[in-house]
Amino acid sequence: MTQSLHPAAQKGFSSGAELYQQVRPNYPQEIGVWLQDRLQIDENSTVIDLGSGTGKFLPYLLQTQAKIVAIEPVTEMLQQLQQAHPMVISLQAFSDQLPLDDESIDAIVCAQSFHWFANLKTLKEMHRVLAPSGHLGLVWNQRDIDVDWVKALANEIAPFEGDTPRYHTGQWKQVFEHQGLFKFNGLQNFQLYHHGTVEQVVSKRLLSTSFIAAMSQHEQQRLKAKFEQIVFDFTGLNPQDQIDFPYRTFAYHFQKIST
């Protein structure tokens, strides 16, 4: 979500915003404690939800009673957010051009988004708007590939990734290697299960992946059938049967270094 959006984000999230809102998992309840204890967010805080998407992470921020500013560059995603959370301040902007004053923000949270804008220009902009010793939280839900059928699904998807930025590659970490803007304060991880039908929480969820959502409808339907066949082969479950899709949630805590 830099000034030039990656084509997979622009096309996939524009055309797939409604599906994204419907089928993406929420987050574990422990994340609320993490926000308050680690990022020190409370009712006196002002917080940015950066790359907010359709607002899936907003309920956890709202529980802290902080003042929230949701920032999202993709119009269709922002529209879904505004429908779901009309009372939240929301802005259409890029991660490296935040329309906010210097040192005006106590914490920035990027949930399921930082890999899209992991560049030094964004880090500098975050550093600018954060108050002294302000907090940065990066959160991702990741499919638990220690489970055999989840690993098989991941293997099916992998050839289509191309150069699409992804959390699991770890490339997003490179921006933190040679910078004096943020210090790393720790990583916590949690377990999460997304319960629903195979069609809803597995195959349609996978169709909401950026580079898949950018494909033709014909190709998406072919993949949907393939995903459902993989689940059946491993579990014996049909598309309308109930299933728990296992995730691991990773929460990284950084803190601003005052220069």
Task: List each language-model region with its residue ranges.
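Conserved class I S-adenosyl-L-methionine
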Residues: 1-42, 56
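Nucleotide donor/acceptor-binding cores
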Residues: 44-45, 103
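Class I SAM-dependent methyltransferase SAM/SAH-binding core
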Residues: 48, 54-97
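A short acidic, Gly/Pro-enriched loop at the edge of an enzyme's catalytic core
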Residues: 96-107
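A short beta-strand submotif of the Rossmann-like class I SAM-dependent methyltransferase core
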Residues: 110-111, 119
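A short, conserved alpha-helix within the catalytic core of class I
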Residues: 117-125
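Conserved catalytic/acceptor-binding region of the Class I
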Residues: 127-196
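Conserved Class I S-adenosyl-L-methionine
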Residues: 170, 174-259
